[in-house]
């Protein structure tokens, strides 16, 4: 049907007859000469039909060309010629195709939007097949395709085995909410769609496969946002007989190589490492964006003698924190804007946001200055490094809560004051706490997942005695404030796994019912093993330069968890429900 792609026609083909196929991007009738921009997945080439040529066929061609509409599907035969007016904006701009035949393969109905428009997201998702024709969307999808291909090449080259794991599996409700599938042949029982292949890949290590990977589809029934979908894709990896450093060194090299191959992006030769504690202290986040040159500064020692109750209460509390954030040139903020920052931090748990504004010329404006002696307040600002023209914000209260809202403030200030540099800043965050205490549930929860090994603790009694302070062998790869990969060294001894389940409030009977197959596998000579999973959607979005992963997923769901193109989810007939032994119940208002 075609001999060449539109976007690959060049000067080497001048004088040759070619057959092309594609869509009508633009059709222009300029007084007897018709110009058609014919588009396929490789690009655009200009097709010319001149009614003034001494050829009966040309007048017929001109009639066809004159009647074309946007997105009509064509087959064109013609001769490649040098173009008189070169178009440097397209790669085929030095040539054109003088048409000798045009066949309309399919007429397009009037479009809800044109390929060169950028309509609202709902209409784009409803007509996703039209949205994906847009050059920008084609570019982003190709970025994703190249990313996956490059990852596969690298892993295949290093002896990893691509092994599929089940999509219909057992519900293990320890993370997000599962998607459940009724088991028709087992009335009243359900499969679950996998939130990750975590347990299967560990069992593959027990089975002796040594190096595993999979481009895995994962499913989590959770609230959606710009960087989260109900179904998503991850590069899942696992290694036998490795330490944390073995895993990190390998995937660091892989990510450096893939970023350069896919997008020409040069990442640091060695990624810096930062403990979870340091990341929270300096940046108020376990996924710090190092492009923003702002840090939180602990000032508890300098405010302890003040009479400002929020500060002194935080200093007196064993888990309290008083932190400051200096924003260079931030004194331009009005009182209204400062109040907006306070309202913003309130979303993250702040009960107030103190400040000190150092005018370029004049006095310091601060509602908390009266609670300090003049020398003490000057010493506080000096310790922070505040200069004329700056503003300093203060947060006080529970350590984790202060870290969270001051970290959020740091990110917002970085954006608002254009402090984010245009580079790539990867790092490893390590030494996460093994557990978090859930006040509401009155029990420990795993910070990573229940299968992560504790660090520097081999004795079960020691783990029980130091559960609050125990660190895990977990690690995250962070890039520009995004967690792009997370992994750990796993528990490979069944008695340690049982102890962790116990600390998480999972009884022996529950552990056997939910994870008995894993505990059994660990009994039969499980090797030390570890791994990592990378978010393909998130990495593709970063490389493509978009803030929403929906742009790099061919058929994403809306934030309302719907597919507007197929109208999913949809109702099911009573007959189908009966076959799978399910009765639906609408929620009460």
UniProtKB/Swiss-Prot annotation:
L-aspartate binds at residues 174, 220, 448, 490. GO terms for biological process: aspartyl-tRNA aminoacylation. Residues 198-201 are annotated as: Aspartate. It is found in: Cytoplasm. One of its GO terms (molecular function) is nucleic acid binding. ATP binds at residues 220-222, 229, 483, 535-538. It holds the Pfam family tRNA-synt_2. Homodimer. Belongs to the class-II aminoacyl-tRNA synthetase family. Type 1 subfamily. Catalyzes the attachment of L-aspartate to tRNA(Asp) in a two-step reaction: L-aspartate is first activated by ATP to form Asp-AMP and then transferred to the acceptor end of tRNA(Asp). This is Aspartate--tRNA ligase.
């Amino acid at each position: 049907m075609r001999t060449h792609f539109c976007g690959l026609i060049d000067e080497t083909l001048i004088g040759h007859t070619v057959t092309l196929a594609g869509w009508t991007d633009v059709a222009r009738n300029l007084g007897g000469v018709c110009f058609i921009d014919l588009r396929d997945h490789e690009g655009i080439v200009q097709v010319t039909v001149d009614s003034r040529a001494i050829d009966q066929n040309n007048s017929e061609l001109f009639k066809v060309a004159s009647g074309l509409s946007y997105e009509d599907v064509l087959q064109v035969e013609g001769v490649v010629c040098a173009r008189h007016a070169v178009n440097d904006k397209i790669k085929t701009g030095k040539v054109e195709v003088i048409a000798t035949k045009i066949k309309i393969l399919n007429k397009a109905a009037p479009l809800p939007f044109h390929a060169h428009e950028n309509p609202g997201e709902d209409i784009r998702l409803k007509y996703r097949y039209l949205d994906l024709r847009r050059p920008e969307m084609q570019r982003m999808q190709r970025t994703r395709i190249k990313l996956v291909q490059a990852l596969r090449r690298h892993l295949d080259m290093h002896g990893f085995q691509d092994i599929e794991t089940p999509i219909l599996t057992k519900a293990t409700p320890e993370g997000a909410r599962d998607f459940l599938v009724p088991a028709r042949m087992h009335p009243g029982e359900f499969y679950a769609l996998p939130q990750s292949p975590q347990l299967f890949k560990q069992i593959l290590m027990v089975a002796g496969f040594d190096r595993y990977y999979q481009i895995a589809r994962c499913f989590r029934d959770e609230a959606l946002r710009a960087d989260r979908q109900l179904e998503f894709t991850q590069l899942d990896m696992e290694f036998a007989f490795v330490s944390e450093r073995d895993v990190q060194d390998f995937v660091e090299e892989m990510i450096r190589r893939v970023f350069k191959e896919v997008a020409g992006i040069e990442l640091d030769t060695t990624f810096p490492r930062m403990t979870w504690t340091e990341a929270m202290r300096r940046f108020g986040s376990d996924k710090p964006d190092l492009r923003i040159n702002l840090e939180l500064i602990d000032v508890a020692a300098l405010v302890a003698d003040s009479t400002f109750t929020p500060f002194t209460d935080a200093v007196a509390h064993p888990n309290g924190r008083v932190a400051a954030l200096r924003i260079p040139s931030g004194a331009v903020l009005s009182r209204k804007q400062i109040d907006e920052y306070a309202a913003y931090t309130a979303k993250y748990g702040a009960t107030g946001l103190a400040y000190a504004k150092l005018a370029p010329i004049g006095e310091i404006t601060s509602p908390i200055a009266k609670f300090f002696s003049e020398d003490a307040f000057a010493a506080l600002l000096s310790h922070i490094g505040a200069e004329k023209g700056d503003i300093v914000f203060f947060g006080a209260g529970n350590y984790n809560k202060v870290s969270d809202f001051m970290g959020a403030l740091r990110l917002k200030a970085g954006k608002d004051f254009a402090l984010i540099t245009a580079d790539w800043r990867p790092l490893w965050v390590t030494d996460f706490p093994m557990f978090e205490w859930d006040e509401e549930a009155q029990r420990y929860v795993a910070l990573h997942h229940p299968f992560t090994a504790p660090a520097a603790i081999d004795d079960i009694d020691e783990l029980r005695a130091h559960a609050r302070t125990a660190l895990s062998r977990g690690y995250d790869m962070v890039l520009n404030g995004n967690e792009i990969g997370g992994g750990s060294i796993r528990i490979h001894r069944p008695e340690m796994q049982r102890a962790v389940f116990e600390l998480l409030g999972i009884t022996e009977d529950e552990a056997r019912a939910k994870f008995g197959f894993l505990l059994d596998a660990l009994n039969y000579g499980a090797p030390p093993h570890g791994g990592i999973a990378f978010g393909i959607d998130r990495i593709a979005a970063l490389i493509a330069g978009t803030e929403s992963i929906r742009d790099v997923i061919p058929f994403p769901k809306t934030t309302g968890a719907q597919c507007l193109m197929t109208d999913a989810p949809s109702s099911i007939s009573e007959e189908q429900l009966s076959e799978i032994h399910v009765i639906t119940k609408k929620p009460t208002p």
